[in-house]
UniProtKB/Swiss-Prot annotation:
One of its GO terms (cellular component) is large ribosomal subunit. GO terms for biological process: translation. This is Large ribosomal subunit protein uL30. It comes from the Bacteria. One of its GO terms (molecular function) is structural constituent of ribosome. Belongs to the universal ribosomal protein uL30 family. It comes from Anaeromyxobacter sp. (strain Fw109-5).
């Protein structure tokens, strides 16, 4: 599955509160922070709404696993 790399290129000062919420939903906190997200219509819709704040590109790297999957793997490793 393809993934999308999103980078916050502008600060959030002066942005509407709704756009700040969307950026937080993408997992971006500070300027120049980067996240790799799954390529879904929901993600692309969020990116479209804040396109003036972010840059994005498709990458072949798989999207990171969810928190539950990581915890399950860690528990399996510990025995």
């Amino acid at each position: 599955m393809a993934a999308i790399q999103v980078k916050l290129v502008r600060g959030l000062a002066g942005c509407p509160a709704a756009h700040r919420t969307i950026v937080a939903g993408l997992g971006l906190k500070k300027r120049d922070s980067t996240k790799i997200l799954p390529d879904t219509p929901q993600t692309m819709g969020m990116i479209a709404k804040v396109s003036y704040l972010v840059e994005w590109e498709r990458v072949d790297q798989p999207a990171p696993e969810g928190r539950k999957a990581r915890k399950a793997k860690a528990a399996a490793r510990q025995g």
